[in-house]
Amino acid sequence: MPAVTTTLTPKPKQSILDWISNHWFAAFLIVYGVWVWLPFLAPILMKLGLTTAGNITYFIYSFFCHQLPERSLFFFGEKTMYPLAEIQAAWQDTSNPMILRKFVGNEAMGWKIAWSDRMISFYTSIWLFAFAWWPLRRKLKPVSWWVFALLLLPMIVDGSTHALSDLAGIGLGFRDTNQWLVALTNNALSPAFYAGDALGSFNSWARLISGLLAGLGIVWLAFPYIYQSQGLNQQLNQLNYGVVLEQIKNKNPRAAG
């Protein structure tokens, strides 16, 4: 009986899912980057007169952020942030957060970013820390769970106390005056530091720092694990393909490569 010659076929082409799996970090930077940076375009669109596109952006991101204007950053206006009293004077004299959040700005005050200051700190820090992690990926091990919890704790405490404070009404709660901090520090700092949400205030610093720490914790825990698992999956795929080729060769010594 003549020998049967088997031609080994090349490794099949990658599917889209395989490509994403092998290039997951680039896919993350692009997809998450578009999602996290798009809110910064909202005030630019409004300034350019593209109000429909700008309002659509605000609407989409309203599902991911409270967008309260007194806790948001503004572009193209007199100030970067405005106190609640100025927002109420320009919009409506109300403490209803569902009404306040609809104020996106005007020509004089500028236009707010579709993220609040906390979300800017949290969401963008994940993207930035991920970018910084990549060159260190082979050396940096996942952070321990207790350190991860400690990094999340400031944002949990700050966010939950703000939520409780807002139950008394926007601008009326204990996190709006921070009298507890005045007593704790013996009123050693300026009134502008204790009260309100302006840049440089305690509330502003708390949201900025807690968001950065939470973003650092998420990247430091999740990304090393993802990198390790993706590396193992790629090695497993190569091993499986190599085993199949070896089995074919063993069954047919005259197989042509």
Label each PLM-derived region with a short phrase.
Residues 8-21:
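Cytosolic juxtamembrane amphipathic/interface segments immediately preceding
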Residues 19, 135-143:
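Membrane-interface helix-boundary motifs at transmembrane edges
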Residues 22-52:
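N-terminal signal-anchor transmembrane alpha helix
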Residues 31-42, 125-129, 143-166:
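Small-polar-interrupted transmembrane alpha-helices in polytopic inner-membrane proteins
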Residues 47-115, 171-199:
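Extracytosolic (periplasmic/ER-lumenal) interhelical loops and adjacent juxtamembrane/interface segments
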Residues 113-133:
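Hydrophobic alpha-helical transmembrane segments
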Residues 124-129, 210-225:
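Hydrophobic cores of alpha-helical transmembrane segments in multi-pass inner/ER membrane proteins
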Residues 230-255:
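Short, highly charged, low-complexity non-transmembrane loops/tails of multi-pass membrane proteins
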